[in-house]
């Protein structure tokens, strides 16, 4: 599996709890993966297609959470790529299609399509968390990121120039130095800087892959600048990054099953601080806890969190405290 596919796999498993963020992410998937068409009989259909099963399953999950429906995923051969498959989801009920399009502000209450439809309605992107959710959806639908061991490149492919321009503006608002370029018939919004790409992965909540990206980036810098120290530095970086990635995975498992609020007293704060500061050292994490604790205290709490996560894996679900 490519680095980009691994990022998408992690992001596909991230379902925000806030309804407004779910709407923003769905809006992006609709823009980049769907075709809205009116039939001769006056019906409105929403046709979704993607080559990624994980992304398609997330699209269905968002529809289920927002509209309480479970549409079928249709698997078909991709005629453009041999030995590949595409995944389709078709909404053919006119009333449901209108409800979906109105929720994401593609249709007005009078069921009219707006001319020169923007990237997404300003109401949907009003909150910074929703802008990040929208960016996550856009990347899942039409984005890619190169393996940091080969190059530093992040891009989202748009079929229209105005969409690429607006997406570029959105990323700039989030503090990312995004650029746009034309590639044949496609408009590409892209980012080159390694630190900026790492920030993007963090914004989209690909925390584990962000740590792997940072790990690779730091290793590459060490190799290029201080060759004689590579072996020692690599071992330390790998140890720290792998430990942090494992902790993030444990916390996300708990968050998606029993919920962080059900952790024993003191562990819930530790879990939230680790999620918020995935690259922080044990000492730095200890300073962020109220009241502050030492490295041994942080290590003890993270170990307890790991034990709870392991019990969840063993039992195959959420567990009760104690």
For each predicted feature, which ranges?
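N-terminal low-complexity or simple alpha-helical regulatory segments
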Residues: 1-103
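Short, hydrophobic/amphipathic alpha-helical patches that form generic packing surfaces
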Residues: 24-32, 133-141, 272
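Short acidic, hydrophobic short linear motifs in intrinsically disordered regions
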Residues: 40-47, 149-150, 281-283
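Short helix-coil junctions and helix-kink-helix linkers
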Residues: 48-50, 155-158, 288-293
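DNA-contacting interfaces and partner/effector-binding or oligomerization modules
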Residues: 57, 61-81, 90-214
